[in-house]
A protein has these predicted regions:
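Structural alpha/beta surface segment adjacent to cysteine/selenocysteine redox centers
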Residues: 124, 129-203, 215-220
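Non-globular targeting/processing and membrane-anchoring segments
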Residues: 1-132, 212-221, 226-227
Length: 227
């Protein structure tokens, strides 16, 4: 009989029969939208000028991962009243589990993919390129110096290195801009690493934008290496 035939799912949402899970997904989206609105309201009340880009539910009940414009991601409670800065770690396995790692990896990949190669300092691999790594660097950073000393052997191993400007403080911005404004950035970077004073920059450059991009994906020191 007709009643025995399986009913076609037309995607209609009802309060009583979320058979396909669409209704529960809609409820979750609505909850997340309310949370974004609550967060923005609370930020404004506290005189924090920041924009919420996206939020995602975590495996922890009532705890959400929040991606902010120009800032490192944070966590918040479901009511948007409490913020948690730093990593959220799950115990109980043989290794520690970073709850937000997958979310962070996703936005990092998108951010790095948005960079124009011509805005970077690129050290290509020797022979076949096996890997490409992105390095947020600063000419004043001692560990960046150490890494740079091994560039030839890194390239010889088939690894292409792409430097991104990340001045560690306002006082280091002019030096980084001088490198990025040079006709040959590699030569300028080598000279700056060696302690040379480069002439002041006088060009449109991506140094500050690259710094902000680094901040948005959680960079808080150099060298910060991503692949």
């Amino acid at each position: 009989s007709q009643s025995d035939q399986p009913k076609k799912d037309d995607g209609t949402l009802t309060a009583t029969a979320p058979a396909t899970g669409q209704a529960s997904n809609l409820t979750e989206r609505n909850a997340q939208q309310r949370l974004i609105e609550n967060l923005q309201k609370n930020f404004k009340t506290t005189n924090i000028n920041v924009k919420v880009l996206e939020i995602k539910a975590t495996e922890v009940p009532n705890i959400y991962w929040v991606n902010l414009e120009g800032m490192s991601p944070i966590y918040t409670t479901a009511d948007g009243k409490y913020l948690i800065q730093g990593e959220l770690i799950r115990l109980g396995d043989k290794t520690l589990h970073n709850v937000g790692e997958a979310f962070q990896s996703e936005i990092s990949k998108k951010a790095l993919a948005s960079l124009k190669v011509e805005d970077l300092i690129v050290y290509p691999a020797k022979g076949k390129t096996k890997h490409v790594v992105y390095v947020f660097t600063d000419i004043s950073c001692p560990y960046c110096h150490k890494l740079h000393e091994h560039m030839a052997e890194i390239n010889a191993a088939g690894i292409e290195v792409r430097y991104i400007a990340w001045p560690r403080g306002d006082q280091f911005i002019p030096g980084m801009e001088s490198v990025w404004c040079s006709a040959d950035r590699k030569v300028a970077f080598d000279q700056a690493i060696a302690g040379a004073q480069l002439p002041p920059a006088n060009c449109k450059n991506p140094v500050v934008d690259q710094y902000k991009l680094g901040q948005s994906i959680g960079v808080n020191g150099t060298p910060a290496i991503y692949n």
